[in-house]
Regions:
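Residue-level signature of alpha-solenoid helical repeat scaffolds
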Residues: 65, 150, 170, 206, ...
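Fungal secretory targeting signals
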Residues: 1-24
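Aromatic- and glycine-enriched pocket-lining scaffold segments that form the walls
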Residues: 162-233
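Mobile, glycine-rich extracellular loop/lid and propeptide segments
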Residues: 139-152, 168, 195, 205
Length: 400
């Protein structure tokens, strides 16, 4: 792998070697838009010293996943954008960065506050006193760990760097300490061991199934974990009568009735795709397709554009930096499902949302906001990378 340095020595340049990939003419519009969006994401929000985008920890794992997905689709453009260098810099620097986290929940929406690095001044704040910090992409929240594990799995797929896959394996080892809840095999959200939520369990299943296909010496172990977890998840009641995934389970291990966030409808699709690919069983695709169709029906507006479950995009909070990431997670995983179980509905939904983002949710500098319907709201790193997920997904489906 070829390395040099740019950005004053902060960002390593790494060329990703692979065979030349054909370019689909009709998809080129989305390639050009994704190229502009990735360039803007990295120029405006990336901190090379910490390896993080916009000081947002778990969101940065999603931004990295988006870059990795673009790389698998368009290698030449990825090399022009130095995506391999951003991967390597994030791998080297983010795992050494002191990150301490506070998460609160208000009416079902989680809000994360991060203190990045001890010398930033935030450690003097009372809220952060006594909070734990971890190295190697681990922290107090198992869902955060799951996002990073998936990011390194996708980075491994794109770059072929064994260190990335090894990191995902290491992260999952810590995630396994989340087991032991009162809700059968369900895992806890955090190391406080109080809440069994959907997203952590979806990520747990998805990471296990993904590793089963990539770590041959432990494939049967990971696959057994993933299969048992889906058996539990599908029967736990967390999927409601409308085939939508609620936020989590209550203290009696019953569906808590909280919001059906878009990302909870998305991650499970990716997990079921990985289970299908690992087993060859179409049963998993049937379940995934049912959830995907229910989510589109419930969360799309009259124009077919994805809107968060509580219409938070144009509220005073604009969904917060956590919620701003959600819709991209759904579209990304819908694309994964479409690749193995294609549906005209899925393709048209992805294209329609990518087009609306570019037309209605972009400013003159190619920043992408949270309201995919428009009007444009000042973008953040999370809103921008989330919208990029839709544009990258459009590349994949435009000419299938």
């Amino acid at each position: 792998m070829l390395h040099d340095f740019s950005w004053g020595g902060f960002v390593a340049r790494a060329s990703l070697a692979s065979s030349v990939q054909p370019r689909a003419t009709d998809a080129q519009t989305y390639v050009d838009r994704a190229y502009a969006g990735i360039d803007r994401l990295n120029a405006d929000w990336y901190n090379a010293a910490t390896g993080i985008w916009d000081n947002a920890w778990w969101n940065s794992a999603n931004a990295l996943t988006t870059l990795a997905d673009f790389t698998t689709l368009r290698l030449d453009e990825a090399n022009e954008l130095n995506i391999g260098g951003f991967m390597r810099t994030t791998f080297n620097n983010a795992q050494k960065t002191q990150v301490q986290t506070i998460k609160t929940m208000n009416q079902g929406l989680v809000s994360s506050t991060y203190c990045i690095e001890l010398d930033s001044g935030c450690m003097a704040k009372r809220d952060f006193i006594g909070k734990r910090g971890f190295d190697d992409f681990e922290n107090d929240y198992y869902d955060d760990e799951g996002w990073w594990a998936l990011a390194w799995i996708r980075s491994y797929d794109a770059a072929g760097d064994q260190e990335y896959l090894d990191m995902a394996v290491s992260i999952f080892q810590d995630m396994r300490t989340a087991s032991g809840s009162d809700c059968s095999v369900g895992v806890y959200w955090s190391k406080d061991r109080e809440y069994v939520n959907a997203i952590t369990n979806e990520l747990y299943l998805t990471v296990a199934a993904s590793l089963a296909r990539r770590v041959s010496e432990k494939s049967s172990t990971y696959l057994d974990i993933a299969k048992k977890h889906w058996d539990w998840f599908s029967q736990s009641g967390i999927i409601n009568d409308d085939d939508l995934v609620n936020d989590g389970l209550d203290s009696k291990c019953k569906n808590n009735g909280l919001q059906t966030w878009s990302y909870n409808q998305g991650v499970i699709l990716g997990g079921l795709v990985e289970l299908h690919l690992a087993t060859g069983d179409n049963f998993y695709l049937v379940s995934a397709t049912k959830i995907a169709k229910a989510a589109i029906k419930a969360l799309a507006n009259d124009d077919g554009i994805l809107v968060e479950t509580d219409d938070c995009e144009l509220s005073d909070t604009h969904c917060g930096t956590d919620g701003q990431q959600f819709k991209g997670v759904f579209i990304r995983n819908l694309r994964y499902l479409h690749e193995v179980a294609p549906q005209d509905l899925f393709k048209s939904f992805i294209i329609k949302n990518a087009d609306s983002i570019w037309k209605n949710d972009r400013n003159k500098n190619d920043r992408l906001g949270v309201a995919w319907t428009g009007p444009y709201v000042d973008a953040t790193g999370p809103s921008h990378s989330s919208a990029l997920d839709a544009i990258v997904a459009a590349i994949a489906v435009a000419d299938d």
